[in-house]
UniProtKB/Swiss-Prot annotation:
GO terms for cellular component: cytosolic small ribosomal subunit. The lineage of its organism: Bacteria, Pseudomonadati, Pseudomonadota, Gammaproteobacteria, Pseudomonadales. One of its GO terms (biological process) is translation. GO terms for molecular function: RNA binding; structural constituent of ribosome. Disulfide bonds: none annotated. This is Small ribosomal subunit protein uS9. The keyword Zinc does not apply. Belongs to the universal ribosomal protein uS9 family. Keywords: Ribonucleoprotein, Ribosomal protein.
């Protein structure tokens, strides 16, 4: 491993992303696929690019990501969290603007479990008075 590499782990819902930041030209590779090929939705691609655009480092790094678990939205959020952490390990002064934007904090919301006697987590069977 080269010393010029920065690493960050990101998590969101059940998705986990391992992000490697290397000096480069702005190429983003996720599970050995280009960003545009990996995410079909523009919103997911936008979420991934947010920390880079905020810190104006989009053209400074090549980003290599391995992401596991979750769905499209969860994986995009996990990658964003990982990129944020990797940027902070690269330059601690970036923490303040990233925190203001809300990218540093791990989104702790998880799916609520289904309860016995209920159809879903909170949906109850229809109540009959008589």
């Amino acid at each position: 491993m080269s010393a010029t590499q920065n690493y960050g782990t990101g998590r969101r819902k059940t998705a986990t992303a391992r992000v490697f930041l290397r000096p480069g030209t702005g190429k983003i590779s996720i599970n050995n696929r280009e960003l545009d090929n990996f995410f079909g939705r523009e919103t997911a691609r936008m979420v991934v690019r947010q920390p880079l655009e905020l810190t104006e480092t989009a053209e400074k790094f090549d980003i290599y990501v391995t992401v596991l678990g979750g769905g499209v939205s969860g994986q995009a959020g996990a990658i964003r969290h990982g990129i944020t952490r990797a940027l902070i390990s690269y330059d601690e002064s970036l923490r303040s603007p990233l925190r203001k934007a809300g990218f540093v904090t791990r989104d702790a919301r998880e799916v609520e479990r289904k309860k016995v006697g209920l159809r879903k987590a909170r949906k109850r069977p229809q109540y009959s008075k008589r």
